């Protein structure tokens, strides 16, 4: 499991542990602010937020194209090399960076999918571990079900919301970060995509001290776009609300704000953010 690999190979700090460390060090106000942010994240349908301090990244280039950005249409030209040599040159950059791992709440996802008619609802007293097992059963099913597709697309859309909101609460813009999607676990890792130099600790500070503002800003922006109603009803998202210039694993394909707020090209009955508000403790 990709998520298990992150916890096994990287330095990952849970916000609960960070809050405890703050209190033990005499920083009660910072701990209170962090705990308030964790509650706000829960109310926004987020189960956990973790700080990843040494995420390994390797960028490898083996060709280029100036015609099509779509991988299925592009025909790559190899990097210059000796044509007598059967080997192709690769250009690679290896580094470690920092990121924030965000996981959507499995039980809230289950309730959201049920409200939209994609699956039967959970029982009233469904424990968290059962909801997590349900999530994996759905997302690893072959062929992909409507439920799995919805989980994949809402995870991707939520990831872009959070990337867009970074500019208001950190030293990074949406062009300075990238996403590593773990859609089968309804998770996304947003990491710094500046590989030569960056301010180490910038994202960690965001998660530890400004989590509430970051999440509130992201979720509030989902409900409207300057290009509405065309953006939501016809496209599902645009560069003003969801799309990013760099850092998207899917080249901004499949983004649909309707999965977050309802409506959109797929005419989603109820958005995930609305469900999260309704079922929040």
Model-derived segments and their meaning:
Residues 1-281:
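C-terminal accessory domains/tails appended to large, multi-domain proteins
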């Amino acid at each position: 499991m990709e998520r298990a690999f992150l916890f096994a190979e990287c330095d990952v700090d849970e916000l609960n542990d960070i809050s405890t460390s703050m209190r033990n060090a005499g920083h009660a106000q910072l701990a209170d602010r962090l705990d308030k942010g964790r509650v706000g994240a829960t109310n926004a349908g987020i189960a956990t937020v973790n700080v990843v301090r040494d995420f390994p990244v390797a960028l490898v280039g083996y060709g280029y194209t100036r015609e099509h950005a779509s991988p299925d249409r592009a025909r790559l030209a190899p990097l210059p090399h000796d044509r007598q040599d059967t080997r192709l040159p690769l250009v690679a950059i290896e580094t470690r960076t920092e990121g924030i791992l965000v996981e959507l709440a499995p039980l809230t996802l289950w309730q959201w999918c049920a409200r939209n008619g994609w699956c039967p609802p959970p029982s009233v007293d469904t424990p968290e571990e059962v909801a997590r097992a349900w999530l994996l059963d759905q997302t690893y099913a072959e062929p992909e079900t409507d439920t799995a597709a919805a989980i994949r697309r809402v995870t991707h859309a939520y990831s872009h919301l959070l990337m867009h909101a970074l500019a208001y609460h950190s030293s990074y813009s949406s062009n300075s970060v990238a996403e590593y999607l773990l859609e089968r676990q309804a998770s996304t890792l947003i990491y710094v995509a500046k590989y030569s130099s960056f301010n180490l600790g910038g994202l960690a500070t965001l998660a530890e001290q400004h989590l509430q503002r970051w999440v509130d800003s992201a979720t509030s922006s989902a409900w409207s776009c300057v290009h509405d109603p065309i953006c939501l009803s016809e496209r599902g998202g645009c560069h003003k609300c969801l799309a990013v210039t760099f850092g998207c694993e899917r080249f901004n394909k499949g983004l649909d704000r309707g999965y977050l707020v309802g409506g959109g090209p797929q005419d989603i009955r109820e958005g995930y953010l609305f469900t999260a508000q309704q079922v929040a403790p």
